[in-house]
Amino acid sequence: MSNANSFTKEDLIACGLGKLFGPNSPRLPKDNMLMIDRVLKINADGGEYGKGEIVAELDINPDLWFFDCHFATDPVMPGCLGLDAMWQLVGFFLGWEGAEGKGRALGVGEVKFTGQVLPEAKKVTYKLTIKRKVYRKLVMGIADATMEVDGREIYSAKDLKVGIFTDTTSF
């Protein structure tokens, strides 16, 4: 497990290259698909269930790539990108705890969208609480999460599932 409890954008980019937690650790996506600018807090025993929590942020500005294509005259951040960020953070948590392999989103129990991220927004905040960690032949994390834009909760997800696989050829 890493001793660090916060991470910069440079750290997150290093994670995408296999240079943060080691070459066999789960990687974050690179470039445009990395939907996180910083991890403010990560721990293994906090959160609602006492199994870990993560708080992370994404800075919003009108020049972000998705505003140009979703939609041409009605720019809004695609909801799937916020959901993907939540899966990214569950995988990041497992890598931070020392898991090795390739991360894959395995599903989500429930997702609710009650707002939107527009180009004039300033900041998205993700808050995840780990519900369950499985470290057997299958490594898996299950979490609940919320996403806020400028302090207002607009997405919630229950039972986000991410697995870490040493072999994905038959996946």
Curated annotation (Swiss-Prot):
Location of the active site: 70
Keyword Isomerase: yes
GO terms of biological process kind: unsaturated fatty acid biosynthetic process
Localization (cell): Cytoplasm
Enzyme Commission number(s) of this protein: 4.2.1.59, 5.3.3.14
Gene3D superfamilies named in the record: Hotdog Thioesterase
Keyword Kinase: no
Record pathway: Lipid metabolism; fatty acid biosynthesis
Protein known as: 3-hydroxydecanoyl-[acyl-carrier-protein] dehydratase
Organism: Shewanella pealeana (strain ATCC 700345 / ANG-SQ1)
